[in-house]
Structure formats: C-alpha cells, structure tokens
Amino acid sequence: MDRNSQKKHHLLPVFLILLCAVFFIPAHTSAAPRINLEKYKKGDDYLVLAYNTRYGKTTYVRSQPSSKSAKLAKLKHSDALVVDQSRITAGVRTSWIPVYLPSKNVTGYVSTSIMRLKAISYASFRKGASPYAYDAICYGLKYLGTPYQSGGNDLKKGICCSALVTKCFRKAGRSMPETYVINQYNECKFISRRDLKPGDLIFYRSNTLPPYGGLVHVAIYIGNGFILNATGHTGSTYPNGGVCIKALSYGSHLASRAIYGRLL
C-alpha cells in the first residue's frame, strides 16, 4: 500500500464519524428549561393553567417528575391542564409542572419543554359578559374530566358541547333554549375577538361538516385566551376531549372559522 493509500485509509473512519454527526444527530437538542414556579402559586383565587403551545407536537403527563416514569395522558396542541399549586415548592427551579388529572383523580407532571403557564383570576369572571358568567363558568369547571358523548346530556356520564353550555347557564339562572348549537347561536349578538369577555360564547364552523349552517361546536370563553368546552374533535376523554379547557387557538381548522357571540 503506497503512502497516499495509507493516508486515505486513515481518513476514512474520521469521515464516517463526521457523516454520522451530520445526518443522525438532531439539529436542535436542548434540555427542558428549568423555571421557578413560585409566582404561579397564587392560591384558591386563581386558576393556573399549563398548556401545549406547539402545533403538531405532543407531550405526556407523567406519574413522576421524570421522563422514565409512566405515561398518564397525552397532551396535544392547545390542551390545557389545571396546575396543582399544592405541589409547587417555593424557591426551587424545575423542568416539571405538577398538573391535576380529574378523570384519574391524580396529580401528574408535564415537562416544560413545550408548555407555557397562564393564570386566570376567578374575580375576572365577575367582570364578564353578563351577570351569569361567574356562576356559569365555576359550575362548568366542577365537571372537568367528564367524557364527551355526541348528543349526551349527563354531566357525569357523558355530555355534548351545546348541552354543557345550556346546563352551565341554566344553573347560573339564565333561561336557555333547547340544547342545539343553532338555538344558542340565535340567542347571541355578535362581537369581535378583541371584545371577548368571560362568559361569551364561541361558535366554530366547518366547511366539511355542514349541520346547522356549518356550526359544529360551541364553547364558553373563560378569559386570558382559554375556553371551557365539551369536545370530541381530538378525542372523547380528558384532557384531549370531554369537558376540558383549551387555548382559544384550539383546532386551527376550526379556530380560523370561529364566530364570537354574547348572550342577549
């Protein structure tokens, strides 16, 4: 073997290592950020939410603050969970957020990698779109975790979107029409997105499913960019579906066709 051949022979392993680095190592690898959750330990006067901010990305609720622990639930884009403030330790930076799963009656942990946190004060519900907003929203929040059922009317066994809205506002003392989305739509005056207040209704349209003039879903706005609804579009059980909280951008194909209404 001549000298040039020997040099090429020695360079081959180096070339292969570099090739692997280029093609097989992810371009963006970073650990989940460690954050101080203390500012979100706000007490019973606030609803603190952790929500998935990434389109097309999922993450898991784990049984322990470790990626090796059991998976309790999958979180899709816009899914929001109530933070278990009792599990927040003051002064400690962590990459795991404690969240409550009412459907399982347990606290789990979700990585900070694609999650964000926001707080909503219960007092803001009293400044909502109507005198009924506070009681309607608080009543609905009691049933987080109830599964979705098309045409369902039971707050414990299974319920649909329009039945949830009707039950919440009737409980708050407002007369409501029969539980059809189109009837609730006809009870509203229409407002812009920037004018939304807690207690307003959001109607979603679809070009592929045309019942009730294209209306396929209704939700209650609870403030700070979130809705309370009973949904089956991305799953029928909590936290993807059923009675759950979503970011307003939920279901981008639906959110782009939303209509905002205020009960008259």
What are these regions (language model features)?
Residues M1-P33:
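Gram-positive cell-envelope targeting signals
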Residues S63-H77:
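SH3/SH3-like (including bacterial SH3b) beta-barrel domains
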Residues K74-S113:
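SH3/SH3-like beta-barrel superfamily modules
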Residues D79, G199-D200:
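Structural motif
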Residues T146-P198, L209, Y238:
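Catalytic cysteine-centered active-site loop
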Residues M176-Y180, I220-A247:
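Catalytic Cys-His active-site segments of thiol-dependent hydrolases/isopeptidases
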